[in-house]
């Protein structure tokens, strides 16, 4: 109702729910622990601490239906990026952010997709990963 994000349902060819994801814009303040290279990737400037970034949140597959287990996480990311590219063509933007819990299966997945960890966080915080939109397509 507040229009901060949009959630998309991904339906397969048999009209089964295959997965879902949420897209939003997020204001980021990049602290001093973030390398200049990653700061430049996000904001375009190595000395600019504030930036807006696209956020892919709540990325998930439907494991409840055995008929859609073939649907990959890579496919969900690609569909989300297609929507982000449409927004980028209209309003601009440089990078995409994902946040995840510190579980190896999640961190390995995002690193496999080309995301880089933005900064090390405490063990109870979400990990933050970014990727340049140029690297996604």
What is each model feature region?
Residues 1-68, 75-97, 101-137:
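Non-catalytic substrate-recognition and accessory regions of acyl/acetyltransferase enzymes
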């Amino acid at each position: 109702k507040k229009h901060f994000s949009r959630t998309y349902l991904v339906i397969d060819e048999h009209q089964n729910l295959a997965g879902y994801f949420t897209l939003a814009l997020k204001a980021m303040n990049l602290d001093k622990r973030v390398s200049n290279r990653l700061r430049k990737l996000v904001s375009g400037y190595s000395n600019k601490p504030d930036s807006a970034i696209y956020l892919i949140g709540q990325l998930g597959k439907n494991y409840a239906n055995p008929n859609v287990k073939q649907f990959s996480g890579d496919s969900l990311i690609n569909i989300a990026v297609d929507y982000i590219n449409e927004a980028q063509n209209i309003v601009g933007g440089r990078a995409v952010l994902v946040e995840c819990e510190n579980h190896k299966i999640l961190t390995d997945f995002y690193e496999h997709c080309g995301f880089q960890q933005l900064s090390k966080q405490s063990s109870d915080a979400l990990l933050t990963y970014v990727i340049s939109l140029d690297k996604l397509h």
